[in-house]
């Protein structure tokens, strides 16, 4: 029997869930409906388990929530939170089935406000990049052997000690000028920019290091100041940035001519090793000596050549006398040759004057030339007239009525022989003669249809 069809029977009871089933359903519902999201709050009850997992609570003025950040995630965190820290976590809402507790599974953690700072950083970076402030084509090479280094940092900063230690190890005695400035805190960005501009105005050094040690994002924020980036880009002195650690990037790094991961690395990039400098000096000295020796040898060879070319005055006089004698001989020969040519010309003129034969020969040549030109002109005229006659014959052939009839046309004439040009001249009953290319026919008009 089907109880569902019996209206008198009560409906079946709903299924009964176990606690485990309920918690599992609740966890799945939470995880499917709520995505990864950012949550802000104050850290409390922080505990690092022996497994490496972090357990803590996030709270605000009216509520709190349990959180867990497993070891596989927290090993990438930039800091370890402590009770009282104000943080932001990116987490997935879930339910801990064993105790039925609502919790957040943290994927990443950052100090509160870091997201807003990063957004401001990205916006300012895009703006300055659009202006060409970070254009790689504008980056300048560092001098290979600087005579003086400038350092923009705090006198109390560990970065200054790191720079001086590295320079003392690599290049003892290299002059260093400090341009002191606060490197964090309110107004630090403007003071750093002022120190960079002062170094450029004073023009005391060849390379400028802008540096500070590592720290939180807020500690390094002064080096993301727009004024600092613009001062570095406008500096007449090449700038090396060494801010924070290798993973830290600031706008100062993008604006600088060269970015170093740490202050120590900045000092190393800006200074040569003393031994390398000595080896370079020795190499240049050796090249200079070799060049000097080659130049000296070339000069000696030239002196020998010039000495061999020197001639005793008596020998020079004999050479001049010989040259004069040769010129006199050439002049005498030229005069005799000119006299001979003139005598020959006079004889030819006399012969032409006394004999008419030459005149007759010239006239005969002229007549022969004119005859040849007349023959060529007659031949050209004959050819031209032949072409003209051919064109006229072709035109006459096209106009010949027989040729027109041969293309399918016919000539209609009245009985009196008049050619019919217009249907309006015809009347019904008129007799017509129609001529074809071959033969003719007689016809009579039944009706005329003039246009």
From Swiss-Prot:
EC number: 3.1.11.6
One GO MF term: exodeoxyribonuclease VII activity
GO biological process, one term: DNA catabolic process
Annotated localization: Cytoplasm
Family the entry assigns: Belongs to the XseA family.
InterPro entries xref list: Exonuc_VII_L (IPR003753), Exonuc_VII_lsu_C (IPR020579), OB-fold_nuc-bd_dom (IPR025824)
Protein name according to UniProt: Exodeoxyribonuclease 7 large subunit
Entry GO CC: cytoplasm; exodeoxyribonuclease VII complex
Catalytic activity: Exonucleolytic cleavage in either 5'- to 3'- or 3'- to 5'-direction to yield nucleoside 5'-phosphates
Record key words, sorted: Cytoplasm, Exonuclease, Hydrolase, Nuclease
Major location category of this protein: cytoplasm
Function of the protein: Bidirectionally degrades single-stranded DNA into large acid-insoluble oligonucleotides, which are then degraded further into small acid-soluble oligonucleotides.
Organism field: Thiobacillus denitrificans (strain ATCC 25259 / T1)
One of the Pfam families matching this protein, by short name: Exonuc_VII_L
Subunit text: Heterooligomer composed of large and small subunits.
Entries under NCBIfam families matching the protein: xseA
């Amino acid at each position: 029997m089907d109880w569902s069809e019996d209206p008198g029977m009560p409906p079946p009871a709903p299924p009964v869930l176990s606690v485990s089933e309920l918690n599992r359903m609740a966890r799945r519902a939470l995880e499917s409906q709520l995505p990864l999201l950012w949550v802000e709050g104050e850290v409390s009850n922080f505990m690092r388990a022996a497994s490496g997992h972090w357990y803590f609570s996030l709270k605000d003025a009216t509520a709190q929530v349990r959180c867990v950040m497993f070891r596989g995630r927290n090993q990438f965190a930039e800091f370890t939170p402590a009770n009282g820290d104000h943080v932001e976590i990116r987490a997935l809402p879930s339910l801990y089935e064993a105790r039925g507790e609502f919790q957040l599974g943290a994927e990443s953690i950052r100090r509160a406000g870091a997201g807003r700072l990063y957004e401001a950083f990205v916006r300012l970076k895009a703006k300055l990049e659009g202006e060409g402030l970070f254009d790689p084509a504008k980056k300048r090479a560092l001098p290979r052997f600087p005579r003086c280094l400038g350092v923009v940092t705090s006198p109390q900063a560990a970065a200054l000690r790191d720079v001086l230690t590295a320079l003392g190890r690599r290049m003892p005695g290299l002059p260093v000028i400090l341009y002191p400035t606060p490197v964090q805190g309110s107004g630090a960005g403007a003071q750093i920019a002022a120190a960079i501009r002062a170094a450029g105005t004073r023009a005391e050094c060849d390379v400028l290091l802008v540096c500070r040690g590592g720290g939180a994002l807020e500690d390094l924020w002064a080096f993301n100041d727009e004024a600092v980036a613009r001062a570095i880009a406008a500096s007449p002195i090449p700038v090396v940035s060494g801010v924070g650690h290798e993973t830290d990037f600031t706008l100062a790094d993008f604006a600088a001519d060269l970015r170093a991961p740490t202050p120590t690395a900045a000092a190393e990039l800006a200074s040569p090793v003393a031994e390398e400098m000595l080896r370079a000096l020795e190499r240049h000295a050796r090249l200079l000596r070799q060049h000097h020796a080659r130049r000296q040898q070339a000069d000696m060879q030239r002196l020998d050549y010039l000495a061999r070319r020197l001639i005793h005055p008596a020998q020079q006089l004999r050479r001049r006398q010989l040259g004069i004698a040769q010129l006199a001989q050439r002049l005498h020969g030229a005069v005799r040759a000119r006299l001979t040519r003139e005598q020959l010309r006079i004889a030819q003129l006399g012969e032409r004057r006394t004999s008419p034969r030459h005149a007759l020969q010239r006239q005969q040549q002229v007549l022969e030339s004119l005859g040849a030109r007349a023959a060529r002109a007659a031949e050209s005229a004959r050819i031209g007239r032949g072409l003209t006659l051919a064109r006229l014959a072709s035109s006459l052939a096209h106009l010949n009525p027989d040729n027109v009839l041969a293309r399918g046309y016919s000539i209609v004439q009245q009985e009196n022989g008049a050619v019919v040009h217009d249907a309006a001249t015809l009347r019904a009953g008129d007799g017509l003669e129609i001529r074809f290319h071959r033969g003719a026919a007689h016809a009579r008009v039944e009706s005329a249809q003039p246009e």
